[in-house]
């Protein structure tokens, strides 16, 4: 079984759906915590399950470097390796084309990238990316793409688009020769609408199980991100999942749902937690602030997470003040619980046709 998608309800452009995968059902819209190295930082699989995470994301390139494909084959895939029995989506390594630019070489065949671990060179092709993701055993595989950096010329964006389409075709062909894992195609096109249109036509003409919007939220202005998404999302098939790659702020998430997006991922909630920032229903809260030294309140009184049920702002501030890792753990639990709660409330609001009210509430505190 690869993937089955049901579109249960729409409210304006917002979509309430359900994805059936080999390791479970995913209710959408949904936020996916990022577990780059087969772990979500500072979280156990049990904790992830308890906060309501439905699906997590792993990074194919990093997992290919360490622990290596032989380890995944030995364990029978990532689910057994990390003891997470719910769905996993893997990024193809296309983002590393963008992020690991030093010493890279891009050809029609693939991308020569330096390992951030030891500087060794690796030629990543669409075929190798599929072999990696097949060995990892992810429920959703991403096609290998060229995520171009912001600010490139129209001419260079055309090259990136054409390589993305070529590599998408090769990714699909290779994966189908290996397994029936679900695979998503990725629409690129930088910040040019004519190229987004062309990319969407080319990628959606292929028999992918779902589609992603890539190459956005990579440093450009917010208005550009949203404008490109609102333009691109309607070009994707209604009967397949739509995934925006790299969105973790509550504001962006409600605006993406309002644009017709079903899935999103980001390291943002876990990263800001490690720096003392909590996400709450009344905006961001910096737990390091001196004003919380004598506070008995939880991070968020309306939150039902383990952290908010058991610990005060004063205690968590003390942990950060003393450099205790428990503070980072407790805030990570809270922030990911908040993201799951936000996703759940979004789903309920679409069912009840109250999504715009919820969106307005979020935008009031995350302007």
Swiss-Prot record:
Its cofactor is Zn(2+). InterPro entries: ArchSynthase1/Queuine_TRR, TGT, TGT-like_sf, tRNA_ribo_trans-like. Pfam families: TGT. Residues 270-274 are annotated as: RNA binding. It comes from the Bacteria. NCBIfam families: Q_tRNA_tgt, tgt_general. This is Queuine tRNA-ribosyltransferase. It comes from Thermosipho africanus (strain TCF52B). The lineage of its organism: Bacteria, Thermotogati, Thermotogota, Thermotogae, Thermotogales. The gene is tgt.
